[in-house]
């Protein structure tokens, strides 16, 4: 496993639509392992492949209940609404108010290329929506209500 460089706002790769994964090769397995290591090292709860410069439809998420690896994910159901502060490893030191669904159901492939579904509420729902936006070339700052504000590492540890 290796740490990968996280691309930041302004990098053209973050504005591109990612390609579907058709098979899990050793390179894809290494990418997933590297993404998890990079996410944990950066104290993030989610990371999408384009954030490390790879235009593949892969996200990793861990909101405190263990890692979730999603290949070719899509949201198939959503409900409710939540508004809260959101940040991004690709927009360091900033956060802003974003409204997202309070509940989502997503379908995805696992590393075994079998199909799975996951249901999430609150933080997990927010994270799934946020990471899937990356796969279509969108950053959360496009959805911010009001202005971005500065955050420090200490703010994120509360």
Swiss-Prot record:
Keywords, alphabetical: Hydrolase, Iron, Metal-binding, Protein biosynthesis
Residues binding Fe cation: 88, 130, 134
Cofactor requirement: Fe(2+)
Signal sequence interval, chain numbering: none
Domain of life: Bacteria
E.C. number(s) listed in UniProt: 3.5.1.88
Family statement drawn from the similarity comment of this UniProt entry: Belongs to the polypeptide deformylase family.
Protein name in the entry: Peptide deformylase
Taxonomic source organism: Agathobacter rectalis (strain ATCC 33656 / DSM 3377 / JCM 17463 / KCTC 5835 / VPI 0990) (Eubacterium rectale)
Source species taxonomy: Bacteria, Bacillati, Bacillota, Clostridia, Lachnospirales
């Amino acid at each position: 496993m290796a740490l990968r460089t996280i691309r930041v706002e302004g990098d053209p790769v973050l504005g591109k639509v990612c390609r579907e994964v058709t098979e899990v090769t050793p390179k894809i397995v290494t990418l997933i392992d590297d993404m998890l290591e990079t996410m944990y090292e950066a104290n993030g709860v989610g990371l999408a492949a384009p954030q490390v410069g790879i235009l593949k439809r892969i996200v990793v998420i861990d909101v405190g209940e263990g890692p979730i690896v999603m290949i070719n994910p899509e949201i198939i159901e959503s409900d409710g609404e939540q508004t809260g502060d959101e940040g991004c490893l690709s927009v360091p030191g900033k956060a802003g108010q974003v409204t997202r669904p309070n509940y989502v159901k997503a379908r995805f492939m696992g590393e075994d290329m079998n199909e799975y579904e996951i249901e999430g509420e609150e933080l997990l729902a927010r994270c799934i929506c946020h990471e899937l936006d990356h796969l279509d070339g969108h950053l959360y700052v496009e959805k911010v209500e009001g202005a971005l504000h500065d955050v420090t590492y200490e703010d994120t540890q509360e």
